[in-house]
């Protein structure tokens, strides 16, 4: 790995519910040099995290929004750091306002998260995390949802949509050549009114218009044809398009 390169390992790529065996909630491990940033940690994804790396070596976890399929496995991460090490080890977590109190409420225990997670809110503009930069901007989904860009130096980065109901919200983050990891919840189907999600056509269009260098589709609902979703996005953009699964690895 060169100083300006990134690696992406998919630990989870599922939506809130699915019948696909082995599917887990959103979790994407981005590494550059000695820095490891985890984007989201949804239901069931901690197992894949722990099978792949020592979780306590994470430089940071960045959470896109406060829906359980994107953050709930912070609970097993907290437990692991608390009970497998004496004294407990700590990991930085960046997320929407209220994340720590949401975790505390799950256990009806004030200070539950703070035992081993250093939780802070997303801030405007790029921030430096180890050797990487991270920038989060608000997108339409919940009242406090974020898309996130991770980059190493001036090279192409990774833009993660989180859950997003308006593809144009991603434009400020995407630089020419970036990899766009974007939800295509509805596959090729029309997006249900008020759902605040995207389909493959939305993703392909914004990727083409912003000069993305690669498209990775994720978060596709059960019953939607994933192959057709890839074809629909690929028809709109002249770059590689794939749909991701746990265990997939990409050199960006």
Name each region found by the language model:
Residues 1-56, 145-162, 179:
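Conserved beta-strand hairpin/beta-sheet module of binuclear metal-dependent hydrolase folds
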Residues 20-21, 115, 191-196:
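Short, solvent-exposed loop/turn segments at secondary-structure boundaries
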Residues 90-145, 152:
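Metallo-beta-lactamase
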Residues 73-81, 106, 225-233:
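Metal-dependent catalytic neighborhoods of phosphoester/phosphodiester hydrolases
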Residues 38-42, 59-69, 96, 158-162, ...:
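Active-site neighborhood of phospho(di)ester-bond hydrolases with catalytic His/Asp-centered motifs
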Residues 167-251:
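Cap/insert and terminal regions of metallo-dependent hydrolase folds
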Residues 44-92, 178:
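Active-site metal-binding motif and surrounding structural segment of the metallo-beta-lactamase
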Residues 83-87, 110-114, 235-240:
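Short helix-capping segments at alpha-helix termini
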